[in-house]
Amino acid sequence: YATYSDMAAAGIGTLRYGAEATALIRLAYRWNLTLAASAGRYRYAVNPVVTVYADANNEVLDRNATSYMGDCSVGNTPQLTGFAGFNYYGPKGWGVQAEAAWAGNRFVEPSLVRRTSRIARQQAESPEAFELFTRQERLGDALTLNVTLFKSFYFNASRLTLMLSVRNLLNDKDQLFSGYESPRVRRIRTADTYVYRPLDTRYLYAYPRTF
């Protein structure tokens, strides 16, 4: 579309199922271990329809176009997760918590507009180009380590707790938090014709080490 446009979608259906398990293990009088894991499948079950309007005058640019979303995964939702947490409760209100959290099998948020026939089929001049428009990118696995030191003070029936936390202990600055496909398309001139390619995926990075 050569103009700024808005989109309305209908008939979006997803299928979600999975399982999770947790365990709290007391290792010693002052130590315990928390474990958790989950596995699931979250995907689009049907192909929705999309109507695209020109922003300036509400002209319909594409009406009830099928968006080929079937079998795309729901974006930015980890389908595999794991967690382990150690807790130490020392004397006089001192304590330490250490946590490790992992998320895997994550995908970027797919674009409805990019998968319509007008975009993916008409502007893709080869099967390889069509694959560029419709392939859903998988995000890398994410691992974060957190540590917390705390001290509790007791006043009769009340308690005051002071905490010092370090998040993303490894200071991984390249860890991706989420991402989404751009609905926009690049037009590239080659010789006497044009080819079309999707714009790069937009990413949101996780915070570096924070206190």
Regions found by a protein language model. Give the residues of each.
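Gram-negative outer-membrane beta-barrel transporters
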Residues: 2-112
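C-terminal beta-barrel architecture of Gram-negative outer-membrane proteins
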Residues: 75-154, 178-179
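Asparagine-centered polar/low-complexity signal
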Residues: 9-10, 146, 168-171
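Residues that define the transmembrane beta-barrel architecture of outer-membrane proteins
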Residues: 13-17, 76-82, 141-145, 158, ...
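C-terminal beta-signal and adjacent terminal beta-strands/loops
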Residues: 102-120, 151-211
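Outer-membrane beta-barrel proteins
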Residues: 24-29, 84, 88-94, 149-155, ...
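Surface-exposed loop/turn segments flanking beta-strands in extracellular/periplasmic regions
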Residues: 1-7, 54-64, 117-126, 182-197
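Intrinsically disordered, low-complexity acidic Ser/Thr-rich regulatory segments
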Residues: 62-76, 129-138, 197-208
